[in-house]
């Protein structure tokens, strides 16, 4: 009886060990599967971001190069050198070694390069002012989000205002969020069109940015979550304000790498990535 009882205990222990090994193996398989799903999601997200970001309108480049040629032909060499310098800086930031996350400071530099070029092309027919709080300059942003808004402000807003056009760019922090606003005093956008601008079935014809407001909106949401993106306010004959809403995340190489890979940044736990 004692022998059979002892054997029974041995069998039970073996069954428990076997069950434990099976559970551990199943757990490892589930963990590998979850890692693979996350990897595929991150790759798909990066592919979507790259595809959206690559939709930049080449006409801006062609027009700028044409302007440089005209300046050289007109012996306006200093203006031509300035345009080339601005264009080189603009594309250096645009490329960013393949990164999709850059600092707000670099994003604003890119926007200023763009507006310096446009002011020459448009013969200073509008005024531009940048007012950015210093504490947000070293925060993270998806790159190429301000320039399309500026292009939109030119085409939708101040292009036909005969020297009275004004564009203001303001950046500020509110608690755990940062905002970058592009405001113009132009023609404004009808209410029914404003409602369509950020919808996937957007029927509004955009002469301006080849990237488009919807593209910028989607890229921000893909990277930071659906609570972020663009907000648009417009009044016909009064002007338009487009507001970029981002989380406050200090830019460091570590945080940049985490965001690029689709992981939550250490300094901000509210994101739902």
Where are these predicted regions, by residue range?
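Single conserved hydrophobic/aromatic residue that forms the stacking wall/gate
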Residues: 1-7, 11, 268-273
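Two-component histidine phosphotransfer core
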Residues: 5-233, 239-245
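C-terminal end segment of the histidine kinase catalytic
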Residues: 232-271
């Amino acid at each position: 009886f004692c022998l059979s009882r002892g054997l029974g205990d041995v069998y039970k222990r073996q069954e428990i060990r076997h069950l434990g090994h099976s559970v551990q193996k199943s757990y490892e398989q589930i963990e590998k599967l979850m890692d693979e799903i996350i990897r595929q999601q991150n790759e798909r997200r990066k592919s979507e971001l790259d595809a959206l970001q690559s939709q930049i309108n080449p006409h801006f480049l062609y027009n700028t190069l044409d302007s440089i040629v005209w300046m050289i032909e007109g012996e306006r060499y200093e203006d031509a050198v300035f345009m080339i310098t601005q264009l080189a800086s603009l594309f250096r930031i645009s490329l960013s070694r393949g990164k999709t996350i850059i600092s707000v400071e670099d994003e604003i530099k890119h926007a200023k390069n763009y507006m310096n070029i446009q002011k020459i092309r448009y013969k200073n027919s509008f005024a531009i002012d940048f007012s950015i709080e210093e504490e947000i300059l070293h925060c993270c942003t998806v790159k190429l989000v301000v320039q399309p808004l500026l292009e939109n402000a030119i085409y939708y807003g101040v292009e036909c205002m005969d020297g009275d056009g004004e564009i203001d760019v303001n950046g500020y922090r509110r608690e755990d969020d940062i905002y970058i606003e592009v405001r113009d005093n132009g023609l404004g956008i009808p209410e029914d069109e404003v409602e369509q601008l950020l919808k996937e079935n957007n029927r509004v014809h955009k002469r301006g940015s080849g990237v488009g407001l919807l593209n910028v909106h989607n890229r921000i949401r893909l990277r930071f979550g659906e609570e972020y993106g663009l907000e648009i306010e417009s009044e016909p004959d009064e002007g338009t304000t487009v507001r970029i809403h981002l989380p406050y995340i200090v830019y460091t190489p570590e945080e940049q790498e985490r965001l690029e890979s689709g992981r939550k940044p250490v300094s901000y736990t509210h994101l739902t990535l």
